[in-house]
A protein has these predicted regions:
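Cap/insert and terminal regions of metallo-dependent hydrolase folds
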Residues: 111, 120, 128-230
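Binuclear metal-dependent hydrolase catalytic cores
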Residues: 1-122, 128, 133, 208-245
Length: 246
């Protein structure tokens, strides 16, 4: 982890930010030579500042225990970098373009297109499919997109309502309008040239084979369902995408 230079955040929902400090700590203790950059939209300064403050005692204890030569205190403090929706980050042959995602009412919400030596990957963050999604994904080798099953979420909302659990019923119903439906992602693939589409951040989380069938149904040939530990290798000078489990 000592090679980790930065973390890109799509938005500030808890499930997308909760491990920031663990990444900071892990790379710091392994010898990261500079401060860890945390890049995100408007509000990133306050978020990173709050996380730094929250773990101030943790950093002090570790420096006191292991010594400042091993753990330089200044390298344990993360650095916030604000991105706009049209920001281009470049480092040598690596190019990362931020674009506006649609995750209402969350604003800002970003997605990213990553390009390196002729290969490209788009990461949706959490988003509906929009014209911006089509534009940024056109010609990409791989699109990683969150995916929601409308029938499954609707059934859960209705089930909670039938049990008199109105709060959970409303929460599930609210989820419907800020993740991309399976149908919209499949339609996207028919409208643009794209190498492969992988569903991740599945809603609802398919805890059994029955729920997984919602996502597997009508899956196009160049689509797949990603899982934790899955690697996508895009060899330079090729159009191949090698998918492995590790």
């Amino acid at each position: 982890m000592f090679r980790l230079d930065g973390i890109f955040l799509t938005h500030f929902h808890s499930d997308h930010i909760s491990e920031i400090y663990e990444a900071n700590l892990g790379s710091w203790v392994q010898g990261r030579p500079e401060r860890l950059k945390v890049l995100g939209g408007r509000g990133i300064e306050s978020l990173v500042g709050a996380v730094n403050l929250t773990y101030a005692h943790d950093r002090e204890h570790r420096v006191s225990h292991h010594g400042a030569d091993l753990l330089p205190p200044e390298l344990g403090i993360m650095q916030a970098v604000e991105l706009a929706s049209d920001t281009v980050f470049e480092d040598g042959e690596l190019r990362i373009l931020a674009y506006q995602a649609s995750h209402p009412p969350i604003d800002p919400a970003l997605g990213f297109r990553v390009e390196y030596r002729g290969r490209s990957v788009v990461i949706s963050g959490d988003s509906n499919v929009t014209d911006a999604t089509l534009s940024i994904s056109s010609g990409a080798d791989l699109l990683l997109h969150d995916a929601l099953s409308v029938p499954a979420v609707t059934s859960m909302s209705e089930g909670f309502a039938a049990e008199g659990r109105a709060r959970l019923s409303k929460i599930m119903a609210d989820v419907l309008d800020y993740h991309a439906s399976l149908e919209s992602i499949i339609e996207l693939g028919s409208e643009i040239d794209i190498g492969m589409v992988a569903y991740y951040h599945l809603v609802p989380n398919p805890s059994n084979a029955l729920f997984m069938r919602f996502f597997e149904r009508d899956l196009p040939d160049n689509y797949l369902i990603a899982s934790d530990g899955m690697w996508f290798d895009l060899p330079v000078g090729s159009e191949d995408i090698e998918v492995t489990e590790r």
